[in-house]
Each structure stands twice: as structure tokens, then as C-alpha cells.
């Protein structure tokens, strides 16, 4: 970002002997929305005495996958790299492209209707016994949630890498309670280090209070990671660790046969097999091209791309299949709401009731309201933006049949002191 580069530049000016090593893959820069830009690396490379070194050896992906990635890379118009990547693996691997029609003509109305690729991807999983861990990569959160729900419907062991839309891990009820337990006991000692007795008691109380919560595994994994990294448990270190962490950091997918994720959430991860769902955009941009490049390069052995576009027509592939079937949307879909999809102010009068809820608890739904099934009391309301989205789904023929609590979180309005 501008600030990061300005800091590095200032440090270099103040320390003439300082050596700066900037490492990165410009083709995988998919965080421009955060201010990240490869131009900063290019600017460093232009400075006097600098050297630009391309590291071309790839130890993750099989030969045919790397060939496909190399063929795709020139679609990115602004690139620093020029040399092709070389696979250092013995496996040849497999690249498959399944082409779907962009739309179909309704025989009765004559309207052009979209072709959806959720069903063929699930059929692909069911029909092809891939060895190792498989990941389905989508471009949007909505695509990911619909896909994982369809996998579950077909009895497949799938997990979603959660997307929290900016929700802080620190604000989750289970985390707040754990810290509160430590705070209460630490007041008596006022020591900078959390004693083993206090630590274990706080863990025990939290695990007992939230034993039925679907969110508890995130905190348990967080605690385990903190224990592994810190022999001495400093209170300030714990608070910093919790405050700087995100829910995604503690999403354990090790026991899942199939992982579903957006490309952004899969950055930095790798899988034996990758299946990509790529809907043709109105316009291709470098940002989209880099995102697809990242998705393709997540796999170690096989890459399968389901697409209704032409962008993969010229890359090397072991198998090309044309699937002309007009797949509809699934009969049942799942929407995953974040804190931005509810009217937070509507919860203010029901704090005690909401704190008694646990992740996974069932809620009733009517007219954009969320209520307790036992009493019918309304305790929540969808945001105006989410109400519009729900109306669009209703116009497509979908009706809400059930709702569950995803997370219970702490929240304070901006105007609060």
C-alpha cells in the first residue's frame, strides 16, 4: 500500500547500509482492494543498485497444471515476470476443461436464461473418485455457500472456509466469555503472566458454557495454537493474538474430504485436486485474471475447470468436454448471512435473550424478521439490503424454510460512548 511503501522508503533513506529484500508474485496479487499494488515492487526494482530475480521453480503443482498456468498467465496485461514457471514434480497431472453454454433459450417465453454450474460440479465429484483432498473454488461467497449446501444434500463430507465479511474474531461471544473469565481471576493476582490454574479454569468454564455451540471449535483451535506458540502465557500477548486474528485463521478443514472456498480465502493454501467454478464476467480485468491464476495454482495434482466462458479455450488441457445440458439452480439453497446482513440496532432490546442463544440454534423466520420458535418473539431484523436480496430470491421461486444462528457477537453502535 502507499503507507507501507512510504515506510520502507523512509527507512531506506535513513539507513543507507540497510539491505531490502522484497519477495512476492505479482501474478498472485489479488488484494488490490486493500491497497496492494505490484507497482511498488517495480519501483523498488528501478532503484539504483537493485536486482530483479525471477524464481521459476515450482514445487507444488504437477507438470500439466504448470503448463496450463503458463498458458494462462499472458492474459494478465500488467506483469513483472517474463520467464515461464517450471514444475519440479515428477507427476504429469491432469487438466480438464468442461465447457457449459453461457445461456439457453426458453422454448415458451423465448427469454435467455442462465445456465448454472452447481449441479454438474457436484455430479463431477460423485462420478470421479479423486484421490486426496479436493477443493472447489468459487469467485463469490454466495456461490461457495450454495455449493457446500448441495454437497451436504448429496451426503458428501464437505466444509466451507468461512467468509466473515470483516467480523472480528475478538467480538465472538465465546471469545469474549473466555477473556472475561481470565480477567476476573487475573484481578486477584495482577500478574503479567496467566497462571496454568487460571488458564485451565477459564478453558473449562468456557467449554462447559458453550458446549452445544457450533462456534466453539474455532475458539478451541485458537487456544491450541496459542498454547503451541507460547510457553509462558502473557496476558497482553493473548489479547493481541485474539484481536489480530480472524475466524478464517481457525477454520480447520483437515477432516473434510471436500473443501469449498472462494479464491481469496484459499490464497496460501494447497490441495491435491482443485475444481473451479468460473462464470464468464461482463468484462475481464487484470484483477479477475490474477484471481483465476491464483485459483489454478492452488492444486498439486489435478485441475478441473467448469466454465461458460472462452478464457480457457487456448490453454493446454488433457481433456476437453462440452456439456450442453441446461442445468437449473438447485431446488434448495443456503444463504450465509454476516453481521452486515442484519439490522444490528434491532437486537438492542434483546441482549439477554440473544446471549442465551448458541451457534446452531434454530430460529423462526417471517416477513424479514427472526424470532424465537418457542415464544414467537421477534429478536432480529434483516438489513434493508438483505431484504432486497431476499425479495429477489422470492421472485425466483425460493421461500425461507428455516434459519439458524451462525454466530453470537458483541456489538456497539457507532454513536455509543
Spell out what each predicted region is:
Residues 16, 26, 162-167, 281, ...:
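Short, acidic/turn-prone active-site loops that include or flank metal/cofactor-
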Residues 63, 133-291, 296-304, 309, ...:
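Core RecA-like ATPase module of SF1/SF2 helicases and allied nucleic-acid translocases
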Residues 86-94, 98, 123-129, 185-216, ...:
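Extended, charge-rich low-complexity interaction segments
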Residues 52-54, 77, 81-85, 124, ...:
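Flexible, surface-exposed loop/gating regions in the mature catalytic domains
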Residues 2-110:
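Conserved RecA-like helicase ATPase core segment
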Residues 4, 37, 114, 118, ...:
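Amphipathic coiled-coil/heptad-repeat helices and related helical stalk/stem segments
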Residues 313, 317-417:
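Conserved active-site motif detector
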Residues 105-130:
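Conserved interdomain hinge at the start of the Helicase C-terminal
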Amino acid at each position: 500500500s502507499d503507507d507501507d511503501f512510504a515506510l520502507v522508503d523512509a527507512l531506506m533513506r535513513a539507513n543507507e547500509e540497510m539491505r531490502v529484500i522484497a519477495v512476492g508474485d505479482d501474478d498472485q496479487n489479488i488484494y488490490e482492494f486493500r491497497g496492494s499494488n505490484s507497482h511498488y515492487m517495480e519501483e523498488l526494482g528501478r532503484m539504483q543498485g537493485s536486482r530483479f530475480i525471477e524464481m521459476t521453480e515450482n514445487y507444488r503443482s504437477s507438470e500439466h497444471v504448470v503448463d496450463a498456468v503458463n498458458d494462462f498467465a499472458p492474459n494478465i496485461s500488467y506483469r513483472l515476470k517474463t520467464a515461464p514457471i517450471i514444475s519440479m514434480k515428477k507427476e504429469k497431472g491432469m487438466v480438464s476443461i468442461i465447457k457449459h453454454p453461457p445461456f439457453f433459450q426458453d422454448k415458451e417465453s423465448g427469454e435467455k436464461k442462465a445456465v448454472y454450474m452447481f449441479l454438474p460440479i457436484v455430479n463431477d465429484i460423485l462420478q470421479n473418485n479423486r484421490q486426496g483432498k479436493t477443493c472447489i473454488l468459487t469467485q463469490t461467497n454466495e456461490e461457495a455457500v450454495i455449493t457446500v449446501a448441495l454437497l451436504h444434500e448429496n451426503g458428501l463430507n464437505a466444509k466451507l472456509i468461512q467468509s466473515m465479511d470483516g467480523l472480528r474474531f475478538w467480538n465472538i461471544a465465546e471469545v469474549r466469555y473466555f477473556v472475561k473469565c481470565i480477567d476476573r481471576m487475573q484481578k486477584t493476582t495482577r500478574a503479567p503472566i496467566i497462571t496454568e490454574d487460571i488458564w485451565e479454569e477459564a478453558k473449562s468454564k468456557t467449554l462447559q458454557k458453550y458446549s452445544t455451540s457450533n462456534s466453539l471449535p474455532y475458539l478451541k483451535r485458537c487456544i491450541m495454537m496459542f498454547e503451541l506458540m507460547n510457553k509462558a502465557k502473557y496476558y497482553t500477548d493473548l489479547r493481541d493474538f485474539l484481536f489480530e486474528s480472524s475466524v478464517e485463521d481457525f477454520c480447520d478443514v483437515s477432516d473434510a474430504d471436500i473443501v469449498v472456498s472462494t479464491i481469496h480465502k484459499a490464497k496460501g493454501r494447497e490441495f491435491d485436486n482443485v475444481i473451479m467454478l468460473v462464470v464468464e464476467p461482463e468484462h475481464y480485468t487484470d484483477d479477475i485474471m490474477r484471481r483465476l491464476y491464483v485459483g489454478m495454482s492452488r492444486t498439486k495434482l489435478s485441475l478441473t475447470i467448469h466454465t461458460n466462458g472462452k478464457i480457457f479455450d487456448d490453454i493446454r488441457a488433457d481433456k476437453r468436454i462440452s456439456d450442453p445440458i441446461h442445468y437449473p439452480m438447485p431446488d434448495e439453497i443456503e444463504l450465509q448471512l454476516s453481521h452486515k446482513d442484519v439490522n444490528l440496532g434491532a437486537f438492542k432490546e434483546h441482549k439477554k435473550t440473544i446471549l442465551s442463544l448458541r451457534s446452531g440454534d434454530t430460529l423462526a423466520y417471517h416477513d424479514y424478521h427472526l424470532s424465537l420458535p418457542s415464544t414467537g418473539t421477534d429478536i432480529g431484523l434483516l438489513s434493508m439490503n438483505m431484504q432486497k436480496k431476499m425479495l429477489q430470491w422470492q421472485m425466483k421461486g425460493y421461500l425461507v424454510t428455516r434459519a439458524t444462528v451462525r454466530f453470537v457477537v458483541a456489538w456497539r453502535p457507532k454513536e455509543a460512548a
